[in-house]
């Protein structure tokens, strides 16, 4: 799986977080956030840090603080969706950086 594919998967999983929250399955939503961070985001984190450390730091905060708090404090579907949408914008930027990194690797070989 390439870095950009992992980002696409993360975005899909975050959409599911909003859906689970909307279904009042807050624990499922929170678990999905943590699993997505540990199983998917951490896998591309190294490549991203080299390109944009601040972006990685922002996303880590979103995954570990902002989104879980929006869920645990029961801020409502719109608030959770707003956090996810902000994360999606950052993930789009991360995806572009990973596409560039992949191109760079192919040019080397």
Q: What residue ranges belong to the model's regions?
A:
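Soluble extramembrane regions of membrane proteins in the secretory/endomembrane system
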Residues: 1-109
């Amino acid at each position: 799986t390439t870095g950009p594919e992992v980002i696409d998967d993360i975005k899909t999983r975050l959409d599911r977080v909003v859906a689970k929250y909307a279904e009042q399955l807050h624990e499922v939503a929170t678990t999905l956030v943590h699993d997505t961070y540990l199983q998917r985001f951490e896998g591309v984190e190294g490549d991203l840090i080299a390109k944009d450390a601040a972006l990685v730091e922002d996303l880590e905060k979103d995954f570990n603080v902002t989104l879980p708090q929006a869920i645990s404090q029961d801020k409502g579907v719109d608030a959770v969706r707003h956090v996810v949408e902000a994360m999606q914008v950052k993930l789009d930027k991360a995806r572009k950086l990973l596409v560039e990194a992949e191109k760079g690797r192919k040019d080397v070989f």
